[in-house]
Amino acid sequence: MPVLPELAQIQFKGFSRFVHQKLLKELENFPKIEDTDKEVEFRSIGNQYQLTEPSLEERDAAYQCITYSADLYVPAQLICKEDQIVQEEDVRLGSIPWMNSGGTFIINGIARVLVSQILRSPGIYYNRESDQRGILAYTSTVISDQGGRFKLEIDGRNRIWVRISKKKKISIFILLVAMGLCKRDILQNSRYPRIFSNMFKRQKESIESPEDAIVELYKHLYSATDADVFFSESIFRELQKRFFQHRCELGRIGRRNLNIKLTLDVPETESFLLPQDILAAADHLVEISYGEGKLDDIDHLKNRRVRSVADLLQEQLKLALNRLENLIRQNLSRAVRRKRAITPRGLVTPVPVIAAFKEFFGSHPLSQFLDQTNPLSEMVHKRRLSSVGPGGLTRRTASFQARDIHFSHYGRICPIETSEGMNAGLISSLAIQAGVNTSGSLGSPYLEMSDSSGEEQLVNLSPAEDDYYRVASENLLLSEWRGSEKEIIPVRYQQEFLSVLWEQVDFRSIHPLHHFSIGASLIPFIEHNDANRALMGSTMQRQAVPLIKPERCIVGTGLESQVALDSGSVAISEQDGKVCYIDGNRIELSLIHEAKKNKLAQPTTIEELKIFERSNNNTCMHQKPAVSLGELLRGGEIVADGAATVRGELALGKNILVAYMPWEGYNFEDAVLISERLIYEDIFTSLHIEKHEVEICATNQGPERVTKQISQLDGYLLRHLDDDGLVELGSWVEAGDVLVGKLTPQEGASSSRVPEGRLLQAIFGIQLVNARESCLRVPIGGRGRVIDVRWVYPEDDATNDLEVIHIYILQRRKIQVGDKIAGRHGNKGIVSKIVPRQDMPYLQNGTPVDMILSPLGVPSRMNVGQIFECLLGLAGEFLETHYRVVPFDERYEREASRKLVFAELHEAGARTNNPWLFEPSHPGKSRLIDGRTGDPFGQSITTGKAYIMKLIHQVDDKIHARSSGPYALVTQQPLKGKSRRGGQRIGEMEVWALEGFGVSYTLQEMLTTKSDHIQARYKALSAIMTGKPVCKPKTVPESFRLLVRELRCMGLNLERNFISEEDLGREFENI
């Protein structure tokens, strides 16, 4: 397996480019600021900026729930023009959130990640579209750097229009004149003057000057009335802002693309659209309409660019500096007008910069909550590409072509891993070798085939260059075919797959996983799976929870170690040294080379370990030492494993003995049977940490108090509180127990009515105040062990009146009925029954099966890779061998995977004296014995070791029940949702289920009495508790009353009358 680049490099390189290039560019563009009288001038020296080290460590910032940031200082000068006095000092512009060692940002103690956005690159694109009448027309779309766009289109009479929207278009002649050209310049510089001369003749408006064109352009685009509009500076500024700046600013990348497309020679520093650009675009549009030239493929990656961390942060810094500029201008003018002494520090405040970044990280769609379910989910989240967001596509309007796989995605964007649902095709993932260059283009490395020297050189090809070369597919055996010059090789060339001679190959892929993402690259035998199931497998790997006893997979692909290393979940020794101290919190290394230089003291380095830290997804992040005392280490070696790593390799699940067979119908439709051994031996036991918080603030009646003395509650609920009113560490708490005792003062409305209250108020003017309890309790299903109690003071609280208490509770969850489990091939299921181990089927050597899967879930879903994995895992279990199988091994020979599996099974049976492992009559199957009867089953059954993961979709988080609870105010029906302690909605399918069992009276009570009858439901509850029969209500339920009220609102009066049977019969006869 070749060495892969760092998987999180897109984040690190983007932030480095922001700090060293983008930040300097924006600071240098900060303008000089003068007061209204131009007596005093403020200027900043942006090229001498300084960024200080963050004041806190990453772990301390997360612990104290503050932002991990660095302060930005810039030298500033204040020049008094009259006296020529210059004041210069360093001013603090604000704080910039700093990227940590994991490639994420700590914002208010929470890990967040900036997702890269892929959108259309600025420039010009030619296409053929149909108008509202279905007539095809050639168009050219100009896309600005800010995402604004307009179109040039040519109709059947060779007239060229500028279209701003579906309903608004103007003649190109008006736009050109508004940009400063006259008729003579247009005719002289155009390659098709006859078309423009015909347009001039048909022009109805009389336009002689740019002012007339600006007025006409404004009237056509933005005027809401038909009144006369005259040229003015306000109209010019509004048009400049709403049209030219938003739709005509190309930027450096857009200018480069425009020059290449239209063969122009305009400097890249000219970022705005020029009149000659419009003329050249119109000329090329005419050529396209005559059949000369090619149309653009807008979905090609050469027409896309990636907005990485650098671009997103630069945009926010630009916005913040604009706000700071306005604020400095106001402060300077006010100080000069009032003749106050001013200094540069007195004019600059860090609030605009801090507020802009806080708003960006808190509300921007591309600033997302980091998925920390396991190390793989973190890494995949950092490498995600989003087509939605500001300036991009939308979920509802994105076309199928924009979502589909494109041939230019090869080696750059994974064709498998994407979101499901409305985001399908819009949220994608980078291929493992892909990278982003400085211009935002996605590149992919290839090996260049040299004819003379025979050496292969690594070359990074952009999507635009990829079309001009013959690229061989992912075949590592190409190097062995050099002697056969006449060998036919399959290659990609100009959007097609061809077969050419060896000597005609220009580049080849690096390895078979070249075009897959990380998640898909971790699936062994992925070539034997359907793409939909491979997608589900890569998705569910990100949902696996770390187990308390992680285990390496027997069958892997070889990328497990690099994913674990680059995710940051393992601890690495920075230098060579010897382990001199180990405990659960830290590891100390004595530096060998430094010790030789310094004879007086032996320098050491300390590696602090993560101990039961909560992740964003409530999973447990924990590190365990992986070295022993006195062990010699080299720099870069692993000293501690993470919660989901073993020996430096990713370990998301367990190797479980499975059997593919039906079992009494309990594994019907993706249901799964498990052995009770998985529970008793903590095979699938995981740790989860829940955070509960309560605010302590000052009210109008006084400050809230944290205390244990709460008379309103029973002492049993307060048993875990210490003298300060906080729960003690290590306490085991149940649902309803008090975690923080808190009293909130309130005005005693009832005490003021008693004689004592009125007397005290009349004599002393004292208003009696009582307090209500507002304690923090353990919610339903939140029992566990208290592992941490924190007092947090929010950094944005200027008055220091707000305090927040965080309580962390550790839960140990065993696998149970209702939990979701899955393999790596999209084979998922829900635990339906836990079977005693003596009743489970067992192998011929007496080993009971741990899990029973349905065999019907394999052929219809076409994920045969799980069969290869479980059989090879069985051989590896007996041979005590771990396999790392590179996908697409069919390049060696046909049926290579099947031959490998059967060969290893045969060897395992022969070496361990278990011939039943490989039966020639039924290869891959063996006889199982029924644990209940002791008799063998009638047919051979596929058994093996499969790598099974426990997913975060657990029944403890989903199941909910209530006997009574809150009701809606209008309908008087139970609320919806677990968080509101809601009830079960008896819908259509639930009614069918109850009807199937014939419980008609129970169904009637659920739909009427127990649902929304205010009086009858309390009587029913009392009758059930006392064992008496439930009485039928004499009045109608509340929902019927609501229906009557709604009908009355519509003018329909519904009355209820009692009619005898005879009268009812007469009424029907009259009808």
Curated annotation (Swiss-Prot):
Signal peptide feature range: none
GO cellular component terms listed in the entry, alphabetical order: chloroplast; DNA-directed RNA polymerase complex; mitochondrion
Keywords, sorted A to Z: Chloroplast, DNA-directed RNA polymerase, Nucleotidyltransferase, Plastid, Transcription, Transferase
Keyword Transferase: yes
Main localisation: plastid
Nucleotidyltransferase keyword on record: yes
SUPFAM superfamilies in UniProt: beta and beta-prime subunits of DNA dependent RNA-polymerase
Reaction(s) the record says it catalyses: RNA(n) + a ribonucleoside 5'-triphosphate = RNA(n+1) + diphosphate
GO biological process: DNA-templated transcription
Pfam families tied to this protein: RNA_pol_Rpb2_2, RNA_pol_Rpb2_3, RNA_pol_Rpb2_6, RNA_pol_Rpb2_7
Localization, UniProt: Plastid, Chloroplast
The protein's Enzyme Commission number: 2.7.7.6
Matches recorded under InterPro entries: DNA-dir_RNA_pol_bsu_ext_1_sf (IPR042107), DNA-dir_RNA_pol_su2 (IPR015712), DNA-dir_RNAP_su2_dom (IPR007120), DNA-dir_RNAP_su2_hyb_sf (IPR037033), RNA_pol_bsu_bac (IPR010243), RNA_pol_bsu_CS (IPR007121), RNA_pol_Rpb2_2 (IPR007642), RNA_pol_Rpb2_2_sf (IPR037034)
Superkingdom as given in the UniProt entry: Eukaryota
GO MF term (any one): DNA-directed RNA polymerase activity
Catalytic class of the enzyme: transferase
UniProt subunit comment: In plastids the minimal PEP RNA polymerase catalytic core is composed of four subunits: alpha, beta, beta', and beta''. When a (nuclear-encoded) sigma factor is associated with the core the holoenzyme is formed, which can initiate transcription.
Family: Belongs to the RNA polymerase beta chain family.
NCBIfam families: PRK00405.1
Record function comment: DNA-dependent RNA polymerase catalyzes the transcription of DNA into RNA using the four ribonucleoside triphosphates as substrates.
Full protein name: DNA-directed RNA polymerase subunit beta
Gene: rpoB
